[in-house]
Swiss-Prot record:
Protein name: Phosphoribosylformylglycinamidine synthase subunit PurQ
Claim: Nucleus is one of the keywords in the record: no
Catalytic activity: N(2)-formyl-N(1)-(5-phospho-beta-D-ribosyl)glycinamide + L-glutamine + ATP + H2O = 2-formamido-N(1)-(5-O-phospho-beta-D-ribosyl)acetamidine + L-glutamate + ADP + phosphate + H(+); L-glutamine + H2O = L-glutamate + NH4(+)
GO biological-process terms attached to the record: 'de novo' IMP biosynthetic process
Pathway, per record: Purine metabolism; IMP biosynthesis via de novo pathway; 5-amino-1-(5-phospho-D-ribosyl)imidazole from N(2)-formyl-N(1)-(5-phospho-D-ribosyl)glycinamide: step 1/2
Pfam families (UniProt xref): GATase_5
Lineage: Bacteria, Bacillati, Bacillota, Bacilli, Bacillales
Xref: InterPro entries: Class_I_gatase-like, PRibForGlyAmidine_synth_PurQ
Name of the gene this protein is made from: purQ
Length: 227
């Protein structure tokens, strides 16, 4: 399986994402600069965290216009797995690939610590290796991670089982404790916590690795078993 890590000016979690795929998952991965127009050779697309374009205007508001995002949109329409973490989640929301918005944390402070998440839906291509309601420890590092949506959108997310992760103890004011959501099709996941920073027991825990293992399992079942 071949992954692409999209790198924007100001990305700073791309190396962590690359390490998670190459060294922990053992799969092929490339850094792909934001001006690329073709992602057809890749099986999965990863949008890392950071401060793309300095977070000017709004987090992710400029990155949404990058050439690569047109290719990401195409990949999403093709059903390829798209994972956006932290700033990557913000870019997915700004691009319209996921509903809602990410606003300033309720306490107006940047927060960097490990939090507990509850797996709300383990039937997605990103969460199949978890148990439903499993509690996992994943780091956060954000100042604008407060997920917001209106009541109608929240109702739709709940009815369609699009909420992938919730905070056990809400750190930022996110509506309904939401930490991560998928699109209606189920192939685009955005989450504020950083699973790529929790892939090695020697570095504090590996409870985020199952996100990437789930993607790999889905791909193998679809393209290898049926080959």
């Amino acid at each position: 399986m071949k992954f692409a890590v999209i790198v924007f000016p100001g990305s700073n979690c791309d190396v962590d994402m690359f390490h998670a795929i190459k060294d922990e998952l053992g799969e092929e991965v490339d850094y792909v600069w934001h001006d690329t127009e073709n992602l057809d050779e890749y099986d999965a697309i990863l949008l890392p965290g950071g401060f793309s374009y300095g977070d000017y205007l709004r987090c992710g508001a400029i990155s949404r216009f990058a050439n690569a995002m047109k290719a990401v949109q195409k990949a999403a329409e093709q059903g390829k797995p798209i994972l956006g973490v932290c700033n990557g989640f913000q870019i997915l929301v700004e691009s319209g690939l996921l509903p809602g918005a990410l606003i300033r944390n309720e306490n107006l402070k940047f927060m960097c610590r490990t939090v507990q998440l509850r797996v709300e839906n383990n039937e997605t291509m990103f969460t199949s290796q978890y148990e439903k309601d499993e509690i996992i420890n994943i780091p956060i590092a954000h100042g604008e991670g407060n997920y917001y949506c209106d009541e109608a959108t929240l109702k739709q997310l709940e009815e369609n089982n699009q909420i992938a992760f919730r905070y056990v103890e809400n750190p930022n004011g996110s509506v309904s404790d939401i930490a991560g959501i998928v699109n209606e099709k189920g192939n685009v996941l955005g989450m504020m916590p950083h699973p790529e920073r929790a892939v090695d027991e020697l570095l504090g825990g590996a409870e985020g690795l199952k996100v990437f293992q789930s993607i790999l399992k889905q791909w193998r079942e679809t393209y290898v078993v049926n080959a």
